[in-house]
Amino acid sequence: MKVSLSWLNELVDIHCDVEELADSLSMAGFEVEELIDLSASLEGIVTGYVIDISPHPNADKLSVCKVDIGKSEAIQIVCGAKNIRSGIHVLVATEGTYLKDIDLTIKTSHLRGQISQGMICSLSELGLPPNNDGIAILEEMNIAIPKIGVCPKKQLGLDEIIFDLAITANRPDGLSMVGIAREVSAINNTKLKLPAIDLLHKDYKEFDHNVESKKFASRNEVYSLNLIDNLNGNNDSSEEVKSRLRNAGINSINAIVDLTNYTMLEQGQPLHAFDADLLCELTGKEVTINDFGIRKAKTGENLIGIDGIDYSLSSKVDVITCSNIIIAIAGIIGGKNSCVNKETRKIWLEAALFSPSSVRISSREIGKRTESSTRFEKGISPEITISSVERCLNLLTKTFDCQILEKWINRELVIEEQLLLLRREKINKTLGKVVEHKTNINAGDNSNNIDKSGESQINTLRNIDDHEIEQSLISLGCKLQKDVKGWLVEVPANRKLDLKREIDLIEEISRLIGYDRFDSNLPNPLRPGGLTPKQKIERKVRESLTSVGFQEVVTLSLVAKDQYSKNQVAISNPLLSETSHLRTNLWQEHLNICQRNMAYEQKGCWIYEIGKIYNIDSGRINETSLLCGALVGNKSIGQWQTETKNSSLDYFQSRGILHSALNSLNINITDEKLDENQLLHPGKSSMLKLEGKELGFFGELHPSKLSDLNIDYPIYIFELNFNLILQSSTRKNKLNISFKQFPTVPSMERDIALLVDNNIQSLDISNLIIKTGRPLVEDAYLIDRYEGDNIPKGKVSQAFRIRYRKNKDTLKEEEVSPIHDKIREKLKVEFSAELRS
């Protein structure tokens, strides 16, 4: 929102300088993003008077002008404008002036042999809207002509300071000059000088709705139309109106349109004018109030807007119709088929209150955002809608000798005044004490806070006075009634959208009194912050994976639609088709990352990600937290001895790397046979389990999918339920650090090799060995696995190393042998194993 200081001065008394005002607005929540001094654009520009002109002796299209710019002697300027003549006042850029809009610094130069000591400017060369095709002639601009040699900044409306404010979504009243004036009045406790609004033909008639328009009335939307005659679309606005519109970033069109835009800037209510005669031509009949309607557009319909753009409409877009012909997109832009023009003499003036959500949807659908849609999206109070119409009618009647023929509204406005209870106790409890600074002139040597004058500052704490509370709320326009507990507060129309609860009123009180005036209290006692157990485990997982060589990646959660997936979650308003749905897995993007890295001739790519996936199940959207990753190649730096060796990992190496990373969590993850999975290699994959629950999978990517990636080495991927890891790792018995004494006696190791069916897992065998050999067997683990030549089909050779140890005594051979024989026999029985050693 661009706020003009001179306009603001008309609406409220300002008793501080520009910088103080900017600071106070920023502290109150209206951040001043930029202070713009418009007069800076006219630095070096003066008013000149063309005394005489003569043709250029060496150029047919140039003239040599003698121009008085208020100096002792007139200067000579070579000019090529067709409308140059003697006896006119012009805008002269003197030597050294920099014209920003055309990136030109004026210097004394020779043009075709004639000296030129400046430049006679057009309005466009100064960054202003042009009024003709040539230079600016002040006599033709309907402004007071300044003295010769004086900068015409005041006459051009550029003697101005602009506050560029950032308006937050909860303060729609800040999108109007009146709203900002009220805020300045409340902050500085100064007098408001708002324009008086005369109610012209006060009563509105309620018109009949067609079927579709009734739906909009039921949404508490307001639609008002006023028929006004005896206007003139060929009239220009005053320079004051033009400059104020220009300073707000709005182009001047004609007096009718300009006054609707002027009202919008002043009051915050968008208005639109339809040419009544064009509507009659469009419909082929005399238009009455009952011809107007509001409905949803039909897919395939279109409207050429007043900006000349052809908008394709969908069934989500609300449109205004006349005899069912679309004449505007509700709350956004009017149609060219009914816009005000130079021939306009009669208009239908529209003032409406559209649903913020419907305007937002329509705006997104057509890809257009306007000053009107911005205001409707943030919300407008119904009282503002009607008062703004009256304000615009006042301006039109003052500018034209016009007649208000009809005034219509779609429903009776019933304004329910809601009183909010504001409790004194709640204010003091929420805001705390106010710090009162007092000066002690007779301070002794023992005073703790003594300034250079020898005076000391004494800080005292007190509750907020009732007077301060009442003054703050009254300055906002609230009406107060005393209550036993505090006050009953009636909120003004311009603040009804954001002051809805007691806490909202308390916030306003603290904002206006000043946040810095309240005592700040630290928590007592102070406790150091820290991580939750789950946060600690998550950090530990990251550290562990990084320590074994993984790199963390963060991939986009938005993906393209997968034609083979039926449980994807669609985004309601995607920006691109490539980001139209939420992801259902993490591994897909991980494979793409591996492919890109290997294409750049990296030795390997080990990555992981802790992220969320989304899917629809029985109509509900589920969110799952996963730990996923991929390994391809070998990340170790090759040496001269090993540089020529294959750097790919096998299944067991890759699984061991993941096992090493997760081993620090003190959780027992087991591998089991994985059912058929089209993503993974059928013989090199496993289902991972944690405490009997399915944790996820680990395995080599299926050869058919690997060939699509054009990578020479196998890729191993894993997907684990991260919530299950957190649940298991954060149990008290896992978090408590336990100490196991190092063994003080030697162990005895024996190897055992056996031939078993290839569907028997090594984990089952090692578990049986440990269980059978208790308490002497300390550990048993796989040291070799072979299937191929000299091994029967369907069989596999597995070799295990068994470690025996007693707690206190050294083991003897005669103690180990019976246990070892028992294990051998048990393996034969349980797995039909053929012992090889």
From Swiss-Prot:
The keyword Phosphoprotein does not apply. Its main location: cytoplasm. One of its GO terms (cellular component) is phenylalanine-tRNA ligase complex. It catalyses: tRNA(Phe) + L-phenylalanine + ATP = L-phenylalanyl-tRNA(Phe) + AMP + diphosphate + H(+). This is Phenylalanine--tRNA ligase beta subunit. Its cofactor is Mg(2+). It comes from Prochlorococcus marinus (strain SARG / CCMP1375 / SS120). It is found in: Cytoplasm.
